[in-house]
Amino acid sequence: MTLKNFEFNVIENDKFARTGIIETHRGNIQTPAFMPVGTQATVKACLIDDVIKTGSEIILSNTYHLMIRPGVDRIISAGGLHKFMNCKLPILTDSGGFQVMSLSKLNKVDREKGAIFNSHVDGKKFILSPEESIRVQKGLDSDIVMIMDECPKKTTDYDVINKSMELSIYWAERSKIAFGLNPHKGLFGIVQGGLFKDLRTKSLNELIKIGFDGYAIGGLAVGESQNEMFSVLDDLKNIMPDDKPRYLMGVGTPADILGAVKRGVDMFDCVMPTRSGRTGLAFTWNGRINIKNNKFKNDNEPLDPNCSNLNLNKYSKNYLNHLFNTNEILGSTLLTLHNINFYQELMSSIRENIKKGTFDKFHDEYIDKL
């Protein structure tokens, strides 16, 4: 069977904001798109079929965690990640580089060997090179594959950021070679360079020379302010390729997403809606609420009376408050699904307003509210 090639087309523009379609052989993705995070082959506390019912068209999973547990060979034996977790949606996997830097007991970053580290689970030694990261992601049968890059810890040291960016470009070249010819999959480059305009510009230009199916913006959501993040996006919005999807990694809040879409970003992922859902924080069109608060004990209205999806409007704030204050697992499931559903409603509204040419008005109405 001939598999459909990976493809991206812009549909509408409203200044820098735009809608589009990413086509994969496992399904199409409307952009701007939000990807729920399924770190360890599961969107925590949720059945994948329920995640699909929220309107999610793609999810993200994590190479670092999956190569440690259960190991790529087990997933290959199951027929790939989609069959392993019974997921019909396209899946994007990150390279594992960010988690290596942030979670593991890192021993060494070697230009040729890659990242040499010990597992945060049992201390086992791993070597993650650009070639190994691509090998693992191919074994997972990911639909969108991320290159191996180095994501340094937050710093304002120009020389440190420059050295890291140069290493990431070298690893990008090796990732592209290791990926080979796989037209039915997408390989994304990752723009690094911290908060420095010249380094971000150089990183992007070098990645364009190598040639990728999409371009991610990495090294943000690591402690910088929202204004600093938007400044980086402003620096890049005029020079990012128009015909490739743009992915802002690890972002973010609804306000972050609105501001990034205004600056031309097409794709997002973040643990916020799922992690918040497990801790009792709900996103609504009127802002965030902590469902564990005592004021909801006698509130028999649903979180969102207009949300008929998954019958989520059948559950009152009174009941959800009870579930969380008695540590019942169902509370985490319901609120996680509510939050993912809210994020997908947000993305749908963003796309609709871009289509109508009213995105700026929508942005201004909600940027400080959500």
Regions found by a protein language model. Name each.
Residues E166-I169, A178, N182-L303:
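Glycine-rich phosphate/ribose-binding loops and adjacent secondary-structure elements
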Residues S133, S164, S168-W171, S175, ...:
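Alpha-helical packing segments of well-folded alpha/beta enzyme cores
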Residues K154-Y158, N162, G214-L220, I329-S332:
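Glycine- and acidic
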Residues M67-I68, K153-K154, G223-E224, S276-G277, ...:
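Short secondary-structure capping/turn micro-motifs that flank functional sites
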Residues G27, I59, D94, Q137, ...:
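Conserved, mostly hydrophobic/aromatic
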Residues M1-L181, N293-K297:
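Non-catalytic, usually N-terminal nucleic-acid engagement modules in DNA/RNA processing proteins
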Residues T2-I21, I29-A33, T42-A45, D149-T155, ...:
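C-terminal extensions of enzymes
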Residues H25, W285, K355:
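Short, ordered coil/turn segments that flank beta-strands lining enzyme active or ligand-binding pockets
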